[in-house]
Amino acid sequence: DVMKCDKIVEIPNQYTVHGMRPQKYPRTGYLFCNGEYEVPIPNDGRHVADPKEYRYMFTAVDGETMKVAWQVIVNGNLDNVDCDYQGKYAFATSYNSEEGVTLAESTAAEQDWVTVFNLKRIEEAVAKGEFKRIGGVPVLDGRKGSPFTRYIPVPNSPHGINTAPDGIHVVANGKLSPTCTVFDVRRFDDLFDDKIKPRDTVVAEPE
């Protein structure tokens, strides 16, 4: 068998795509792409020397058209990504919550976080035109306090994240901290409705 390239997609407002995962349910609707490093927005050279204008970006590529469907600006970088078996959420690990540029700065905090994306809320906002068009694609602001995201603190420098075959549990593993954080995806609804706190979604954390 020979694998041939079917499509090359240019993703604006982002580079160093690290974690990448197709949507599981109800079909491969999206391909989720994590931006590991920040990029100046707009990325046309005008802000290249101004760190305050740099942003971390999460991208969803439409699996049928292979065009960028939308992007979400987040706090902190995005490492690996996965999604649920219900078609409601995607979630990504984030290290360097300090946004440091040296090893000492970027590993100083005892905790980083997992960023959870509410796909329905994002899609509704895009459909209503509640976005900025940057680089030709819809961009939403998902930084802390946004209705589109939640940030769940986890031990230092999480790396991998995977959904268990039971469709209920999500496991994020630490890279600098030898810890696995286990979430119950069924609690994410209450998290986004502000009925519980972020850490209330954690059901186990073996070290």
Question: What residues fall within each predicted segment?
Answer:
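Predominantly soluble domains enriched in secretory-pathway, periplasmic, or organellar proteins
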Residues: 1-207
